[in-house]
Amino acid sequence: MDAAIVSQLSGPPALVRDAADLRPAGRGGYLLPRGYLSTRGSQIVDDRGRPVRIASIGWNGTDGPPGAAPSGIWTVSYKTVLDSIVDAGFNTVRIPWIDLGLDTPLHGYSDRLGWINTTLNPELLASDTPRTDGRYRYVTTLTAFRRIVDYAGEIGLKVIFDHHTNQGTAGQQRNGLWFDLGPGTDNTDGIAPGRFSAEMVKENWLRIAKTFAGNPTVIGYDLHNEPNGDRGHITWGGGGPTDIKAMCEDYGSAIQDVEPGVLIICEGPETYKPPPQSSGMDPTLAAPAGNLTAAGANPVRLKIANKLVYSIHEYPEEIADTKRWGIPETGKGFVDRMNATWGYLVRDNIAPVWIGEMGASLRTPETREWARNLLDYMNGKYGAEGGPTFSGDQQPISGSWWLIGPSNDPPYGLQTQWGVGHFRPDQIAVTDQMLFRPQK
């Protein structure tokens, strides 16, 4: 690495940590300090300027259709799910939301929307009295989020909220965008008739920001999950309705007016084929994990500096379907692709990148090699190949494993059953490598 870059990355002298700030999680990981976070160069830092690592895991369920419950609470309490996250060594949970679901009561009685064990989750009841059919009424999704954040704060776990889709379609939004109504769309979400304009999505973000304003348990807002540049004709700059850089600046700065403490997390649009020249992104590079090729020269600019974190999602072939596009998932080609499409931001001390989703079944040699390559890259072991490196009190790249609990589909989840413990040995061995271990 160039000596000037090493000098830039070394930053100020290491700051001595107060032992009271070092609150252990499980498996040798540590919780984050109690306050908000900021950025310095490509490091995420606490409110005293000390580097930290966001070691997070996703908790699904509320990315489903309106009324869908957080996963697992048919078997255990939501508090037990949060306890299990800390027990696994993580310090943050990433929770999805959809526009159509914020004000919808949790259903609680559906295989599709999730069941709720009322005995174990009494805080989620809207009324202690059942309806005439014997079923209980539950709180809205937004109220459930309040309960979750309250308990997360009690145990020292941080929360990042993620705008997943407008209406709760499975996976990423099918039109590739963060809105499904108005200019830039065909007035559908790719499946159903559109219901949410870009301005309406912004207003929902502001509702969430107002709900948790002043509460440093909530440390970040992931503005939109997996924007797809191929489907959505997304640009980086240019000012049109599908300009994702403009959206991040507009939404992010508006959120900062309400809640100046949080990190604003901006995902690069997925481009499985090189985007057109007019996109503002590098027209020679495919970026299935998220295209941040333009972020270095044309960065997102917020009202409050040092609060911007970029994000991408890294998955192997079994999930990301990269082979048919000729995109390598391991080896030199994998490292070169990460360097060019997002890793340079960290290597050159431009901005932090948080891998907002990552995961694999680890049941095949290919997925195990993918995990080894990715974790080695995150931990600075590919410096000779042009990847980021870390020294002194710097922390490696932050990430979020997908997902807590068991699942029937790849990547199958970190656990074999709900509750504290029950970890899959192959997955927990990988996630142990992404935990926060501060310099003492």
Mark where each language-model region is.
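N-terminal carbohydrate-binding accessory modules
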Residues: D2-R94, P105-L120
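Structural recognition of the beta-strand scaffold that forms the well-ordered cores
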Residues: R53-W59, N91-W97, G101, K158-T165, ...
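Short, solvent-exposed loop/turn segments at secondary-structure junctions
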Residues: W59-G64, I98-L100, N166, N228-G229, ...
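Short, solvent-exposed loop/turn and secondary-structure capping segments
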Residues: G67-P70, T104-G108, A170-R174, H233, ...
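An active-site-proximal structural segment forming one wall of the substrate-binding cleft
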Residues: I73-V93, W97, G101-D103, G108-G220, ...
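Extracellular glycoside hydrolase catalytic/binding regions
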Residues: W74, A192-G220, H224-Q395, T416
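Extracytoplasmic/secreted cell-surface and envelope-processing proteins
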Residues: L102-P105, G168-G171, D230-H233, P274-P275, ...
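Extended, alpha-helix-rich binding/interface surfaces that flank or overlap catalytic cores
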Residues: A371-K440
